Amino acid sequence: MLYPALLCAALLLIAPLGHTEGRTLHPSPDAIQFVEQFLDRYNDLTLDDLENLVSSQPEEPSSAFTSGVKVAEYPKWADIPAQGDSTWLRLLKGTLANQKRAVMDRSRRGWNRGCFGLKLDRIGSMSGLGC
């Protein structure tokens, strides 16, 4: 009775050792190059710098900063519109503004309101079971 159970357990343990092939993801060298160029160009900008870049940018998209990846390389379901640098600048500007707003909100809310938060501290003070 013990041998069939051991045999089944051994087969279950050996079964995953068969021919299993996983697909690993390798980043594209073009994508890595694009991210490096992007970070080199926009890494040290402040919100004021971004506003100046957006206001001084011409209407036609600049061809100086291209990723080197052609749209035809993407699958058909990936609908990638052609975007200029102004879209990236607006995105970065919005991100910086949101970070500033989050810091101001955090200081205004005052996260440090006792041991367990405002509601539980109020309940604890009414019942006499505070921390």
UniProtKB/Swiss-Prot annotation:
One of its GO terms (biological process) is vasodilation. Transmembrane segments: none annotated. Its main location: secreted. Keywords: Cleavage on pair of basic residues, Disulfide bond, Hormone, Secreted, Signal, Vasoactive. Residues 1-22 form the signal peptide. It is found in: Secreted. One of its GO terms (molecular function) is hormone activity. Disulfide bonds join 115-131. The keyword S-adenosyl-L-methionine does not apply. InterPro entries: C_natriurtcpep (IPR002406), Natr_peptide (IPR000663), Natr_peptide_CS (IPR030480). This is C-type natriuretic peptide 1. The gene is cnp-1.
